[in-house]
Amino acid sequence: MDILQLAPTHLLAILLSSTSALFLITYLLRAGHRPSDLPNGPPTVPLFGNELQVPKSDAHFQFSRWAKEYGGFFTLKRYNNTTIVISDQKLIKTLLDKKSNIYSHRPASLVSHLITQSDHLLVMQYGERWRMLRKTIHQYFMEPRCERDHWKVQEAEAKQMLHDYLTMPEDHMLHPKRYSNSITNSLVFGIRTKTVHDEYMKKLFYLMDKWSLVQELGATPPVDSFALLRYVPQWMLGNWRNRAVEVGDLMQSLYQTVLDQVKERRQRGIQRDSFMDRVLDTLKQTPLSENELRFLGGVLMEGGSDTSSSLILTIIQAMTKYPEVQAKAHAQIDSIIGHNRSPAWSDWSKLPYINMIIKESHRWRPVSPLGVPHAVAEDDHIDGKLIPQGSSIVLNVWGMHHDSDRWQEPEHFQPERFADFPALASGYAGSERRDHLGYGAGRRICPGIHLAERNLIIGIAKLLWAFEFLEPLGSDSDISAHSGASKGFLHCPKDYGCVIRLRSPEKRETIMREFAEAQEVFARFD
């Protein structure tokens, strides 16, 4: 048949079909391809790019191997999406700090939206709304406020933590969780976590375990890179949507329950100087939706509870494996503090070795080995290589913290590495000479950094003043970074055995007395 004899509608159909086929073929040929103007990286395959090479768990180990081969920044192609992995700490200053106006965004994420409806500060897109919520948090947790007020709650909760270790050593994996969670909930909601059996605490850490697994890089099918996967039956792809919705439901339920408790207390005429009370007092000036209120409190509950407790558990485990470090800490504490009182926040500058131990724990076992991905808002260039607009920017925190060119024998726990870093972590954030990346970088740096540093210093100083931590006879706890920690985008040591030995009878009396004195602070939250 002569094509000229076809009806115009048939000709149009053929033309559209041919154009669509050509477009699809071109897309498939280009998808997964790494253009030459992008940073180098591992070889790609058509369509998939590097998707099949990215591990579904613990990707930071593979990223660190690739960094040795391809340099401090390299490109991964995931279908048509571009991911830039940074393993050179100098680039953190160059990009995320100096160009924070374009490197503070987040990659689009359907999973994050399903969980939070995009109202969670951690995954919220950078913009006016994000800046407003961030400012709200900063005003309550800025350093002067921590120095003036919050340390009293922190010291009281640390005194209970000593009492808990002394009287319930069998729950040693839970005491740091109660400590950090109670500080956070007291300051954010005016609600204490009185025991390790608290229902809010149990639900939060269960939720965090679930969310950590869902949010880990590589754990979810690339539904943002290859949208057609959204229409594949999810049972063929690990039930990714159901997993996300489950986490979202857990968040909504817990955060709404706590928020409702604050509102009910206020309706009874009981006001407290908590973060959420202040937010509710200013709703007319700063209107927030119910979902924004839920997640504003929730993000603080998460960040304030999980990171500090994970690091305290890491440090205690390190003490059992590195007794010479523990002995040195004991000696310094004993030279400053006697038996009649435990260390206080006011002692921190006299206990530099405690500060070194905390910095080394951030380096040795970072809680978030790959951080939370950033996204670049416009085209940028590094050393003549293009960083395309919309690229995901992954900070290989693990690789930078375990770079043998900077850290000799990086797998060893050696606090002396930080002898020349006497200030708190906030003093080095954004500087050329950074101690670690445990709190993130750029404008997305943890807004609770000042509170978290004090949680750790007060808690660890008191614990090492009071106790010696030992491995049980005949046991060998697993401190391997590959097998000794939980999976997900947040890492915490797996349960380990520990013998907790009181360092002197006099300290028992001090612990009991200080716990009784702490009740005066706790009474504010009854």
From Swiss-Prot:
Residues 30-526 are lumenal. It is found in: Endoplasmic reticulum membrane. Keywords: Endoplasmic reticulum, Glycoprotein, Iron, Membrane, Metal-binding, Monooxygenase, Oxidoreductase, Transmembrane, Transmembrane helix. Patulin was originally used as an antibiotic and specifically trialed to be used against the common cold, but it is no longer used for that purpose since it has been shown to induce immunological, neurological and gastrointestinal effects. Genotoxic effects of patulin with dose-dependent increase in DNA strand breaks in brain, liver and kidneys have been detected in mice. However, more recently, it has been proposed that patulin might also have anti-tumor properties. Glycans are attached at N81. GO terms for biological process: patulin biosynthetic process. InterPro entries: Cyt_P450, Cyt_P450_E_grp-I, Cyt_P450_sf, Cytochrome_P450_fung. Its EC number is 1.-.-.-. It is a single-pass membrane protein. Induction: Expression is correlated with the production of patulin. Expression is positively regulated by the secondary metabolism regulator laeA. Expression is strongly decreased with increased sucrose concentrations. This decrease is lost in the presence of malic acid. Expression is increased with pH changes from 2.5 to 3.5 in the presence of a limiting concentration of sucrose, 50 mM. Natural phenols present in apple fruits such as chlorogenic acid or the flavonoid epicatechin modulate patulin biosynthesis. It is an enzyme of class 1 (oxidoreductase). Heme binds at C446. Belongs to the cytochrome P450 family. Cytochrome P450 monooxygenase; part of the gene cluster that mediates the biosynthesis of patulin, an acetate-derived tetraketide mycotoxin produced by several fungal species that shows antimicrobial properties against several bacteria. PatI catalyzes the conversion of m-hydroxybenzyl alcohol into gentisyl alcohol. The pathway begins with the synthesis of 6-methylsalicylic acid by the polyketide synthase (PKS) patK via condensation of acetate and malonate units. This is Cytochrome P450 monooxygenase patI.
